[in-house]
Regions:
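Pyridoxal 5′-phosphate
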Residues: 1-179
Length: 181
């Protein structure tokens, strides 16, 4: 079988699966427990966190684990909105977002945030000229998906980030996954 629906679910890399199984077998304890098995599980999580932090060039304390992408998107968007609410309530996104993003933005809109959707060009990418027009001093967030799950279009994330440099309170949320970091 040739599996092509990677946007819905991606088969786990064999090395990752082997490592997961090895850790599950050797560290079955609850990392929050004070017994030996819990301490071993905590040490394994701490080691993995250190490795991820090094790969991303961040501090381990900046790594937050969630149950999945939907929870992560929800958490990130709401956290940014609440963090920057004193600087503005304007958010820009695209009509192509996953429901975990669009649904969270709808909830924020119901709480008084203003949501604008940037136009998409015929090739499926963000219209950077329209994005530039939508940006305002009170824009606190631009949310885009790196690769559209239906069209497969890669968004110009680097160019979008460059547009935000003049907006110090505007964060860029990119829904994406990292492979082989």
């Amino acid at each position: 079988m040739i599996y092509l629906d990677y946007s819905a679910n991606t088969p786990v890399d064999e090395a990752v699966l082997e490592r997961f199984c090895a850790v599950e077998r050797s560290c079955p304890g609850n990392a929050n427990s004070r017994h030996q098995a819990g301490a071993a599980a905590k040490a394994a999580i701490d080691e993995a966190t250190q490795s991820i932090a090094r790969s991303l060039n961040v501090q381990p304390a900046e790594i937050i684990y969630t149950s999945g992408a939907s929870e992560a998107n929800n958490f990130a968007l709401k956290s940014i909105a609440r963090l920057e609410r004193h600087h503005g309530k304007h958010i820009i996104s695209t009509p192509l977002e996953h429901s975990s993003v669009s649904g969270t933005l709808t909830a924020l809109q119901e709480q008084g945030y203003e949501i604008d959707l940037v136009d998409i060009k015929q090739d499926g990418t963000v219209d950077l000229a329209h994005l530039r027009e939508l940006l305002r001093p009170d824009t606190i967030l631009v949310a885009v998906t790196a690769v559209d799950s239906e069209l497969g279009m890669v968004q110009p994330v680097t160019e979008i980030a460059a547009l935000l440099k003049d907006y110090p309170h505007c964060h860029l949320h990119v829904d994406l996954s990292l492979i082989h970091i």
